[in-house]
């Protein structure tokens, strides 16, 4: 039987505010346990929540960026459940009237563009954190501790429709969403610190079946690699279970990265299990059109708009434009390089940034903001390729030297110091070709007998004689002319 995978994602995005969503406590990460929790976070009797305007504005900004409807009236609700790190015995969230409704997000899976519909995005408070490894009782027995520093940190929970059909598609969506919230400045995107956490709802069904299968939710996956592996494992588990005559149980599961498997955590609740009702301590959040427009005025150029501009202004393919707008810093870096080159050479800049620059950043686990090669320096290097001073191959060696800080990272100084200027003098190259042809009559005969590979062998020997500095195009042209004579 052929199976179809159905995936929907719920992503918890910690909003980059200085204080918590309903209290004045700091949201700074890494403080000593329970030093950033006041009476509201601790749910002490008589304490009342006060809405953080900045959290609402960040939610509005996100809604505008995805083309969603901003609800003119939004209500906070109590989501009732017990957990040790939830002091109130309920979480303040949103249910029937979220702040953001609908919207879409487009992204690339390989070179294929996809668009996913979003159901909603709602504001809520984060819970505290249970710590299980650091504590022991006086008799040595294991114990757990509770850190409430995170309790009350503002979250935007972003929910998709169940429209993704592969783990690769889910990861591509998650990367695009991560890029967007960081681009907008509403989240720092630090997955190791829990700023961006994904829950994946996964089910399978026979291909062609309309009804959804029973889903399992995989909780709090904090890396893109783990998200892909968790979904892949869960899909295999469900298919094997069904094909062996079993039934998938609706439940919440955790991904164990060390064992590369998901395991059951608890039965999956439905909405009615949480007994949602409007929070009587918080008034309705009223969002007037003037407030929406004020937030819209702060919006940066969006990735989608910048992609379209890069395609129109620089003639880039859609895939290149998408890759170069993964982050604002990368997009700004590319644009600075492209505008420092002659007209029509932006594609060369794109190739270098998506190739050599990105590969080096990945190898050294750095962000584009940390590159030692500035945009002006990369543009100067590419200009030396364009004007024929060096070949593309030699340019890669120069780039490595620039990255290492040689000669201040200036390409012209490195080229001069290393004597790397390309040989473009026709007479000099012609003499080298004559020497190679005279020394290799057998290879010349093979080429003239129709063996095309012999040509590449001759080119290789000429470039070796020139120590890689001969202009490759001139070598090809002159060699072909001499062999045809």
Swiss-Prot record:
Family that this chain belongs to: Belongs to the GatB/GatE family. GatB subfamily.
SMART domains named in the record: GatB_Yqey
Subunit structure: Heterotrimer of A, B and C subunits.
Record's keyword terms, sorted: ATP-binding, Ligase, Nucleotide-binding, Protein biosynthesis
General function of this protein: Allows the formation of correctly charged Asn-tRNA(Asn) or Gln-tRNA(Gln) through the transamidation of misacylated Asp-tRNA(Asn) or Glu-tRNA(Gln) in organisms which lack either or both of asparaginyl-tRNA or glutaminyl-tRNA synthetases. The reaction takes place in the presence of glutamine and ATP through an activated phospho-Asp-tRNA(Asn) or phospho-Glu-tRNA(Gln).
Gene that produces this protein: gatB
Reactions catalysed according to its record: L-glutamyl-tRNA(Gln) + L-glutamine + ATP + H2O = L-glutaminyl-tRNA(Gln) + L-glutamate + ADP + phosphate + H(+); L-aspartyl-tRNA(Asn) + L-glutamine + ATP + H2O = L-asparaginyl-tRNA(Asn) + L-glutamate + ADP + phosphate + 2 H(+)
Gene3D superfamilies: 1.10.10.410, GatB domain, N-terminal subdomain
SUPFAM superfamilies: GatB/YqeY motif, Glutamine synthetase/guanido kinase
Keyword ATP-binding recorded: yes
Enzyme Commission code: 6.3.5.-
GO MF annotation: an example: asparaginyl-tRNA synthase (glutamine-hydrolyzing) activity
Name of the protein in its database record: Aspartyl/glutamyl-tRNA(Asn/Gln) amidotransferase subunit B
Ligase recorded as keyword: yes
């Amino acid at each position: 039987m052929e199976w179809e995978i159905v995936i929907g994602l719920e992503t918890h995005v910690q909003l980059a505010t200085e204080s918590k969503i309903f209290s004045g406590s700091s949201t700074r990460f890494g403080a000593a346990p329970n030093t950033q929790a006041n009476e509201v976070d601790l749910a002490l009797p008589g304490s009342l929540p006060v809405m953080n305007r900045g959290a609402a504005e960040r939610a509005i900004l996100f809604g505008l960026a995805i083309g969603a409807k901003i609800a003119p009236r939004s209500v906070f609700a109590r989501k009732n459940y017990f957990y040790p790190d939830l002091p109130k015995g309920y979480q303040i969230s949103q249910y029937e009237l979220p702040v953001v409704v609908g919207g879409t997000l487009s992204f690339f899976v390989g070179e294929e563009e996809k668009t996913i519909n979003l159901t909603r995005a709602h504001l809520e408070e984060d819970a505290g954190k249970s710590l299980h490894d650091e504590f022991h009782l006086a008799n040595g027995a294991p114990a757990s501790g509770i850190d409430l520093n995170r309790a009350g940190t503002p979250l935007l929970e972003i929910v998709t429709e169940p429209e993704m059909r592969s783990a690769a598609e889910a990861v591509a969506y998650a990367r695009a969403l991560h890029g967007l919230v960081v681009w907008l400045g509403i989240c720092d995107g630090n997955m190791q610190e829990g700023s961006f956490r994904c829950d994946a709802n996964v089910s399978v069904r026979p291909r062609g079946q309309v009804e959804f299968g029973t889903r399992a939710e995989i909780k709090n996956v904090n890396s893109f690699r783990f998200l892909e592996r968790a979904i892949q494992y869960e899909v295999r588990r469900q298919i094997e279970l069904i094909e062996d005559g079993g039934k998938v149980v609706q439940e919440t599961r955790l991904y164990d990265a060390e064992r590369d498997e998901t395991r059951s955590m608890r039965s999956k609740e439905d909405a009615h299990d949480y007994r949602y009702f409007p929070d009587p301590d918080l008034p309705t959040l009223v969002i007037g059109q003037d407030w929406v427009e004020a937030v819209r005025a702060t919006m940066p150029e969006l990735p989608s708009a910048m992609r379209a501009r890069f395609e129109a202004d620089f003639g880039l393919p859609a895939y290149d434009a998408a890759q170069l707008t993964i982050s604002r810093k990368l997009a700004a870096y590319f644009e600075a390089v492209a505008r420092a080159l002659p007209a029509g050479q932006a594609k060369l800049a794109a190739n270098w940034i998506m190739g050599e620059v990105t590969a080096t950043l990945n190898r050294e686990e750095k962000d584009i903001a940390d590159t030692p090669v500035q945009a002006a320096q990369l543009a100067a290097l590419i200009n030396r390729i364009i004007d024929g001073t060096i070949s593309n191959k030699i340019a890669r060696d120069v780039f490595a030297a620039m990255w290492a800080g040689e000669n201040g990272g200036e390409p012209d100084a490195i080229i001069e110091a290393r004597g790397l200027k390309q040989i473009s003098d026709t007479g000099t190259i012609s003499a080298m070709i004559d020497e190679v042809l005279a020394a290799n009559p057998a290879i010349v005969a093979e080429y003239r007998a129709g063996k095309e590979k012999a040509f590449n062998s001759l080119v290789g020997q000429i470039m070796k004689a020139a120590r890689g500095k001969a202009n490759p195009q001139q070598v090809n042209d002159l060699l072909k002319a001499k062999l045809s004579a």
